[in-house]
């Protein structure tokens, strides 16, 4: 999903995850109307969401958060694999608290690892490249490519980064809160 600042991108995806309710229309997930469902019910149905500004969970350790995301007691090897996939050394992070000692980029990568651990039907990312350094950005592209190849679900990304747009199969362009264009990348971004 692309569009200028204030075009409604974040508002649109806040309807998918249940943070906001639409004033008209319906939201369907695999043919099921989820418009009236709560955030929790939508998460149970398979929607995960990575915020533009990740949330800090004070008092919780990274390993605990990963277990919550996986929905089970993930073993150390699984947690390490998710953290490694987003470019974090698991040994350095698994026992760290999710507090002010973590940078925005570290939190962003932990949040992306959480989405990977959930393995949901719809993974929504709001500007996932925000606050991430160049090396991590290169790795982020690989993470999305791998998710796309290995998942049966859908990945929805709000971004302006050309390298992320280049891996998209469909681009949605919003303008003034309305759908301006939608189609294959080659047609929307000539």
Question: Language-model segments: what does each one mean?
Answer:
Residues 25-32, 45:
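Conserved ABC transporter NBD signature motif
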Residues 17:
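Helix-to-loop junction immediately C-terminal to a conserved catalytic motif
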Residues 137-150:
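Helical segment within the ABC ATPase nucleotide-binding domain
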Residues 127-128, 135:
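Walker B catalytic motif
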Residues 112:
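Hydrophobic anchor residue at the start of the ABC signature
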Residues 115-116:
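ABC ATPase C-loop
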Residues 53, 59-75:
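Q-loop/switch helix immediately C-terminal to the Walker
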């Amino acid at each position: 999903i692309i569009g200028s600042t204030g075009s409604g991108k974040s508002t649109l995806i806040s309807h998918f995850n249940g943070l906001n309710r639409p004033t008209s229309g319906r939201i369907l997930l695999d043919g099921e109307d989820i418009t009236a469902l709560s955030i929790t019910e939508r998460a149970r149905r398979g929607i995960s969401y990575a915020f533009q500004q990740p949330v800090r969970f004070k008092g919780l350790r990274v390993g605990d958060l990963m277990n919550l995301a996986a929905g089970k007691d993930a073993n150390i090897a699984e947690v390490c694999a998710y953290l490694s996939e987003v470019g974090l050394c698991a040994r350095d992070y698994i026992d760290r608290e999710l507090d002010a000692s973590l940078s925005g980029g570290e939190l962003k990568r932990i949040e992306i690892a959480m989405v990977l651990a959930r393995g949901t039907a719809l993974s929504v990312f709001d500007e996932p490249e925000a606050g991430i350094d160049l090396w991590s950005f290169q790795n982020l592209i690989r993470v999305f490519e791998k998710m796309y190849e290995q998942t049966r679900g859908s990945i929805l990304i709000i971004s302006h980064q050309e390298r992320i747009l280049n891996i998209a199969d469909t681009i949605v362009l919003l303008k003034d809160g309305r759908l301006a264009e939608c189609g294959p990348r080659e047609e929307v971004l000539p």
